Amino acid sequence: DGIHGIWFDYNKAYEILKHFAGIITPDFSLFSDFPLPLKWWNIYRMRAFGFWCTTLGINVINNVRWNNDTLDICYQGIPKNGIVAIGAVASRLKYLKNRGDFEQYFINMIEELQPHTIIIYGSTNYACFKNLWTSGIKIVSFPSRRNKKKADAGDAQ
């Protein structure tokens, strides 16, 4: 069922999730070619799933996903001065043409939410992440499968 299984079969999801100390909310896509209501729906689903887990006593770290169309709502429901997670893989940062917008939105997210810790899935080998090391924001990174394969091959990014 993939990521949608947790939304449509939430009781089964709970039976699995209750065994963990906490979760990162799901990363429902906000592709640029999605209609705006679908982007809003996916942001809603991320926050609603996190809220539901919180009501069940599960610790929640909010995943943050944004694009130009959703900056007015993408941070709603996420506590300030906390821990957030982002995915660098789906952001397509490896392509130079995507980095400018990503960095702008990333800075906007930091200003808006003022997180003390950011969990990053994917490579942190980009200027916007390296600048955070001196800002006092803790960065916790988890390499993607691709990054792990490259590291194993001796060609880490």
Describe the predicted segments one by one.
Residues 1:
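Aromatic- and Gly/Pro-rich donor/ligand-binding loops
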Residues 4-151:
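Eukaryote-skewed repeat-based solenoidal scaffolds used as protein-protein interaction platforms
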